[in-house]
Amino acid sequence: MSSQEYTTFIDIPVTRAQVEHCSYSFWSSLYPKYVPKSIVLKSLPKKFIQYLEQDGIKLPQEENSRSVYTEEIIRNEDNDYSDWEDDEDTATEFVQEVEPLIDFPELHQKLKDALNELGAVAPKLNWSAPRDATWILPNNTMKCNEVNELYLLLNASNYIMHDLQRAFKGCVDGDDIKGLKFDLVLRQWCDMNPALEFRVFVKNAHIVGATQRDLNYYDYLDELSDTFKDLIDEIVHDVVLPKFPDKSFVLDVYIPRPFNKIFIVDINPFARKTDSLLFSWNEIAAIAPPKNDVEDYELRLVTRHNTGRFASKEHSENHVPQDLVEASLNPEAIRELTQKWKELLSQQAKEESSDSENET
């Protein structure tokens, strides 16, 4: 018998109502002074939802409107289509694609109008932002300057698909999304320092812990922890709790320099589906309420350099081969991958040479 102790798995139930309360259009209306300027397009048309769910990405090509994403490609020997690609197209069952200019022209125009009003924007649906799809844009961020960038970012995101298809997954009162209305949020773009974003866990109206959202090491954070906690205490107890209908939730905040203001980035369900970052959910669930209502929670920070985290780009696992992700963190792995690549190219050249000799 091993003497190792095991921690009992603590159940953390979440209801559909709690998830709905974390929808941006719900909570942002309660705290307008603490959120960036944004435009919310409510009750998105079904055709737009189908557009996001369909295979491939169909971008609109408007007359008298130039976009780098829809410029005509001049065919040459390097990019010309092969005969087998044409054959595959004819053999594939025809499926009518949803096109923005045809199927939801009014929404398309509203998106363009919002961009004209706000300038660059960062999009999100009811709950999720497409942070996993930034690889598809040249700037590698969620910053969208034109409507086609919005379409690319939303179409390429697994997080967006989760909102559309599995929004209530894990809810104790059912996960059916029938009749759910979806909103598109366009938040005015601002460059935020990821080191100054924090996630706060509130259980039964008490703060039980807080953590960095960006898991890299920043040497100046520790000496500012008391300042951060004072601002977190203030926004949770004086701003959020008096109006928010639930007493347990996970709050994301941003505290920019000179550290005298705090903004709400998001409100998430108090549930395992929300990333606990530097904590574990069992750890959070097991924290007892404070005695005499005096809160003394931990603001957990990365306390030492972690070269692995610095070398890895957030969500990079979503869009490049795992071999490359691992190689980027290990110089020896890079050399090994390069050698394998050279061997593959050499083998390919030999096979092509052999095929040419057989043909002659």
Curated annotation (Swiss-Prot):
Record-listed Mg(2+) binding positions: 266, 268
Compartment(s) of residence: Cytoplasm
Pfam families, per database record: D123 (PF07065)
Single GO cellular component term: cytoplasm
Signal peptide: none
Keywords: ATP-binding, Chaperone, Cytoplasm, Magnesium, Metal-binding, Nucleotide-binding
Phenotype seen when the gene is deleted: Inviable.
GO biological process: eukaryotic translation initiation factor 2 complex assembly
Regions annotated as coiled coil: none
GO function terms (MF aspect): ATP binding; magnesium ion binding; protein folding chaperone
Effect ascribed to mutating residue 283 to K: Abnormal translation initiation. Sensitive to high temperature
InterPro entries named among the record's database cross-references: CDC123
Induction line: Expressed during exponential growth and repressed in stationary phase (at protein level). Levels not affected by the presence of mating pheromone (at protein level).
Entry binding sites for ATP: 124, 127, 129, 131, 187, 189-190, 197, 199, 213, 252, 266, 268
Family label: Belongs to the CDC123 family.
Function in brief: ATP-dependent protein-folding chaperone for the eIF2 complex. Binds to the gamma subunit of the eIF2 complex which allows the subunit to assemble with the alpha and beta subunits.
Additional record remark: Present with 4850 molecules/cell in log phase SD medium.
Oligomeric form and interacting partners: Interacts with the eIF2 complex gamma subunit GCD11 (via C-terminus); the interaction is direct and appears to be specific for an unassembled form of GCD11. Interacts with the eIF2 complex alpha subunit SUI2; the interaction is direct. Interacts with the eIF2 beta complex subunit SUI3. Interacts with DMA1. Interacts with DMA2.
Full protein name: Translation initiation factor eIF2 assembly protein
Organism, scientific name: Saccharomyces cerevisiae (strain ATCC 204508 / S288c) (Baker's yeast)
